[in-house]
């Protein structure tokens, strides 16, 4: 998968240093993955939430942070749509952000 907007992750872990290792690990794993559907993701990330229209929510640092991505399975693209604290996540609509 090609992860688009790594800078968003990098900027976030500069502000939240405790997230750096897990975000780097997620980025590396996602970059090497060849997901073809949400089931592939659930096999690797059982706690990921599958939303509509290709959106996936990943729990980072034991659900302290939330990462929302939009996936184009055909083109193998992962777009970072949101990374934030759990309380920040509660204020957005993950389906449309």
Task: List where the protein language model places each region.
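Basic, Lys/Arg-enriched alpha-helical interface segments
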Residues: 1-64, 72-79, 86-97
């Amino acid at each position: 998968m090609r992860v688009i907007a790594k800078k968003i992750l990098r900027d976030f872990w500069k502000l939240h240093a405790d997230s750096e290792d897990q975000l780097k690990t997620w980025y590396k794993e996602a970059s090497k993955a060849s997901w073809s559907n949400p089931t592939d993701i659930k096999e690797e990330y059982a706690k990921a939430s599958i939303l509509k229209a290709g959106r996936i929510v990943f729990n980072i640092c034991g659900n302290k942070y939330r990462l929302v991505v939009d996936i184009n399975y055909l083109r193998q693209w992962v777009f970072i749509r949101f990374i934030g604290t759990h309380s920040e996540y509660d204020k957005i609509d993950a389906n449309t952000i």
